[in-house]
A protein has these predicted regions:
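Glycine-rich phosphate-binding loop used to anchor ATP phosphates in small-molecule kinases
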Residues: 55-97
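ATP-binding Walker
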Residues: 11
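Walker A/P-loop
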Residues: 14
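Conserved phosphate-donor/acceptor-positioning beta-strand/loop module used by diverse small-molecule
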Residues: 98-118
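Conserved substrate/cofactor phosphate-moiety recognition/catalytic segment
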Residues: 18, 22-58
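Single conserved hydrophobic/aromatic residue that forms the stacking wall/gate
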Residues: 126-134
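P-loop (Walker A) phosphate-binding loop of NTP-binding proteins
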Residues: 8
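Hydrophobic anchor at the beta1->P-loop junction of P-loop NTPases
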Residues: 5
């Protein structure tokens, strides 16, 4: 079984992946860790500041083939990140799809309305200052 966890930044993907790892003992891959490993090693010309579409276009083919390899070898894996394309399903046959569970985490308007200050507080904790703030 492959568990794909997608969603925008700060929606809880990593926390959910960690909880699923603890519960099911499945290996866990953060696409962000893969991204930074490739960037820091000089294996790609992208940077941490590259736009999400460029990063998705580069990372998804790698992740997609890792998923297929896991399924072909009857291995479980939790994969989380924001670099999963919206049309990811087109890359898999029905046989592969039977082995993939997809979860997309979002904030509902109601949640945002009632928790806006907390969302803002935590987003600001993890956001680098812009050059204008210097």
């Amino acid at each position: 079984m492959i568990i794909l966890i997608a969603g925008d930044t700060h929606t809880g993907k990593t926390i959910l992946a960690q909880k699923l790892l603890e519960k099911y003992k499945y290996p866990y891959l953060s696409i962000d860790h893969l991204k930074m490993g490739l960037i820091r090693s000089g294996q790609c010309k992208l940077s941490a500041d590259s736009n999400d579409m460029e990063l998705t276009n580069y990372l998804w083919p790698i992740v997609r083939e890792m998923i297929k390899t896991c399924i072909e070898n009857s291995q479980n894996m939790i994969i989380e990140g924001c670099y999963i394309p919206f049309d990811w399903e087109k890359d898999f046959t029905n046989e592969y799809m039977k082995q993939i569970q997809y979860i997309c985490l979002i904030f509902s308007q109601e949640y945002i309305k009632h928790n806006f200050q907390n969302i803002l507080k935590y987003c600001l904790l993890y956001t680098s200052p812009s050059p204008r703030d210097s």
